[in-house]
Amino acid sequence: MYRTCWKVSRSRTADGSVVNFVIFIVAVALAFDFINGFHDSANSIATIVGTRVLSPLAAVIWAAVFNFSALFFVGTGVAKALAAGFIDLNVVDPNVILGGLLGAIIWNLLTWYFGIPSSSSHALIGGYAGAAVSKAGITALLWGRKWIETLSAIVLSPAAGMLMGFVLMVVVLNLFRRVTSTKADRFFRVAQLTSSALLSLAHGANDAQKTMGIIVGLLVASQALFAGETGILRHMYVTSLDTIPLWVELGAYTMISLGTLSGGWRIVHTMGTRITKLRPVGGFCAETGGALVILFATRFGIPVSTTHTITGAIVGVGATNRLSAVRWGLASKIVWAWVITIPAAAAMAAITYQLLAAFNPL
């Protein structure tokens, strides 16, 4: 059992106002998951659309199916890490969670509008941290292994993606050096269906779990509200961060898949064609390299950015042709967007938390 530092009066509990507020925040968290799928769908489909293997509509359907299928293949290590590894749970209350979510949502929508492939994952972590610090100061952050891993991943995940994309492309080009480009393209158009599916599964596996972690952290912090419930609300009584309710898993994977179906065409254009021109063989290597890095991180419970990783893989593939094949000016702008994501989302969440606390004190 976890102690919580926020108190609820009997009258407010009795009339259900706080219970309804917590339920509303769960809905907002699932809405963030939808926006994550909408915003980051480009990660999974940019290369397969850029190489014209699938139309945008067919690509998002393909990606959504494999986003959801991650439910059956991966655990919940990332969710547990986000729930317990970053913020002191004794600081968490519904306003902190809602402030963090709204900060991340605002940043995601701004970057989507301007077609910038920033990280939904780091926006969520930054928003969560910003709201907690706004409430309790810097001591709200649990400085330790998970922060080190996540901050390191900001640099290492795109670098690892770039290296994997580069190495796979070199290996594949050597293996197929005696095959005509027409035959190679025909083969990799089919192979890219597999690599795109693998990347979509990796995206769902890592990103949907971040929303699960936020919801479970909220439910554990709010457990006193749901103790003794016998109706449907009994499913919201969670006392341990080690247990992810099935309805939370189903909800998170469903919403990220529906978001992916909605697409994010501005970012698809940026990542699929503007960073570097790709042929099917390049798309296959970028997707496979990016997916392997993300799945490796997911296996060890590290919340990485799928956006960072696949963009790095695309750059690595482009660099095997010649360095000038990569539009480094555009790539540098994307890097700057990555750098400012955590502090920008944190600032927005901090302001949002203060507004919520002023108008809805708990």
Model features per residue range: what roles?
Residues 5-6, 12-362:
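Multi-pass alpha-helical transmembrane bundle typical of ion/small-solute transporters
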